[in-house]
């Protein structure tokens, strides 16, 4: 089992060697964490909706039972971390978050652990993800995009001045406070530079992970695909992709697979919509320069050159956080939820409501049930699944997915039929593990999409969370909703 007592304790001692007159001297330096390890268990919290799901972690809304304080609780699976050699990333994220102090970065309050999991209690951003605002509005106005990107620039300047590269800037990692200000989250891929002002573990700034692929495919710069060392320019490329997505509603290199996305990135195959202003087009074009040293913010002028760009004309950089943010588009699924039920565990009326694509998929509602097959992704359907169908029943959509629980996950085959039925099957034992009660009423059966890979199927009695590695979450939503409205 993973041992992280030292890294998650109240004090950390770093060992290092130095040389004096040819002799090697062992030195140590210790510092106290501002966010200490507490003697809590997850039973001390009322766990609510899932904010996000990663490869080895989940972030859930957690209310402390004794005082009512709400946190975003990051729950990390020790076994998976050890198996996948992610220990260094977890340690580094904890150490870095403890030392960062900026209004545009999520705050770490405390940590705790048990035999199975590590827990980090983070600031809860009740406004959801910037990704949500883009999808609910279709795309953002230029004024909205200018405000949000300016706050990202402000936080990135601080991060880079501290000698850190975030390496996973994207709309899903840009969280919003209840009043609408941006906070950068998820430092699980952070990379400290040699001159970092952050106290880190020995060798954290010099190991070979600087050239390792991390981040998200659609936002990865070409130099990373060519195995070049990480630079601050990596984050500036991702900023350009994010600004493009704010203004257009989609990422600039979107394609059907990661391989195709990478080919478009390497070829710099980018098309600007006609509604982009000249200033917006120019800034994005410069941020997406194939030479990372030429991106605004990465050159000798630093962030001054980025802040002076015409796109940011009128931005009051000194008083940015005191400005009035754009109005947040509410989640339609949460409007009918009564206030007193807010935060109740697994409340299907608003579970996961910080990341729902309610505006997507509506174009398919008028299609007949016979045309649903155009939406469906048939994932290696063969005779193994035929045995689970009733006479005359046919498959409309099927995928190998992970069924996610609070801590663990299990591979299942999710099947939607024309009856209609929704079932999930254990692919190894070939037995039905669950039958999701069908209803044409969206109040009794609805799908909530939190990312291209993650979605929830909600019924009055339970909420089932799934991960589709082939990023067909939205297709599942469309297929089910089209069948409901046939």
UniProtKB/Swiss-Prot annotation:
Q: What positions are modified (Phosphothreonine)?
A: 212
Q: How does it sit in the membrane?
A: Peripheral membrane protein
Q: Which domain of life is it from?
A: Eukaryota
Spans of biased composition, class Basic and acidic residues?
1-10
**Could you tell me which PROSITE patterns the record lists for this protein?**
PROTEIN_KINASE_DOM (PS50011), PROTEIN_KINASE_ST (PS00108)
Alphabetically, the GO molecular function entries are:
ATP binding; kinase activity; protein serine kinase activity; protein serine/threonine kinase activity
Chief localization: cytoplasm
- The protein, known as: 3-phosphoinositide-dependent protein kinase 2
Its source organism is Arabidopsis thaliana (Mouse-ear cress)
